[in-house]
Amino acid sequence: VAPGERPQFRVVFWAAAEHDYWLLPGRYHGQALPMADRWLITRNYCDPALARYSWVEKCYDPTALGYSGLVGRNLLTAEQNARIEEIDVTDLIGKTHDNDAYLYSEPIVSRTREVLLWPGIGEQGAAAP
């Protein structure tokens, strides 16, 4: 890819079990965020597996991206921030970490389809952090 050019791809995270700050510049996956045209991140505050995500590290108390959303969005450039959409799916998914709950949720699948397959159709813009 030539300098200044960026491959065009989109990312959707359902129930993301990743530290909620790892996508920020300078962090573990900090180079990923600028690479995608669109990001859709779901948040579920009732997900029992994500609520216990802190158990993955013995000496630290991380929070899952799928539980809290991306923290530190205020540290991103306006252009990066505009490509991120976060949606709260707590009322749709509830107290489960089961992938089927996402697959059989028409609103989630519909939004995922729009973001991944038809950019620009039904765009709501970046949700508030």
Where are these regions (language model features)?
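Lipolytic serine-hydrolase domain surface
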Residues: 2-129
